[in-house]
Amino acid sequence: LGKFSQTCYNSAIQGSVLTSTCERTNGGYNTSSIDLNSVIENVDGSLKWQPSNFIETCRNTQLAGSSELAAECKTRAQQFVSTKINLDDHIANIDGTLKYE
C-alpha cells in the first residue's frame, strides 16, 4: 500500500491538497494532485485515516520530510496541537497519478 514518495518528487501541500510529480510506467512523469480532505479526519487533535473534512479544524498544513502531512489541529477543548500523519501509508503512485489505497 501507498509509498508514493518512492516514485514522486517535488511534493507540496497547499491546504488539504497534495501535489507531486510522479513517475509513469512508460518512464515519463506526470504532475498529479489529490485532495486529502476526503480520506483524513481530525480526531481530537490527531490526524487519522478516515473519510472526513480535517481541513475545517486544522491549520498550517505542510509537508514534513518527503511523506508526512504536518498540521495544527483543534482538540475537543478547542486548543490547537501539532500532529502528523505518514501519507506513504495509503497514498500511492499509480502510473503517474496519486491515489488513496
UniProtKB/Swiss-Prot annotation:
SUPFAM superfamilies: Cyanovirin-N. GO terms for biological process: regulation of defense response to virus. The keyword DNA repair does not apply. SMART domains: CVNH. It holds the Pfam family CVNH. It comes from the Bacteria. Keywords: Antiviral protein, Disulfide bond, Lectin. GO terms for molecular function: carbohydrate binding. Disulfide bonds join C8-C22, C58-C73. The keyword Disulfide bond applies. Belongs to the cyanovirin-N family. Its activity in situ is unknown, however it acts as a viral entry inhibitor, inhibiting HIV-1, HIV-2 and simian immunodeficiency virus (and some other viruses such as feline immunodeficiency virus, measles virus and human herpesvirus) infection and replication. It prevents essential interactions between the envelope glycoprotein and target cell receptors by binding to carbohydrates on viral protein gp120 and possibly by other mechanisms as well. Addition to cells must occur before or shortly after virus addition. Overexpression of this protein to provide quantities adequate for medical use as a topical microbiocide has been attempted in a number of systems including E.coli, Lactobacillus jensenii, the yeast Pichia pastoris and Nicotiana tabacum; see PubMed:20162270 for a review. This is Cyanovirin-N. In solution exists as a metastable domain-swapped homodimer which very slowly converts into a more stable monomeric form at room temperature. Under physiological conditions it is unlikely that the dimeric species exists and indeed the monomer is more active against HIV. Interacts with HIV-1 gp120. InterPro entries: Cyanovirin-N (IPR011058), Cyanovirin-N_sf (IPR036673). Mannose-binding lectin. Cleavage, or reduction and alkylation of the disulfide bonds results in the loss of anti-HIV activity.
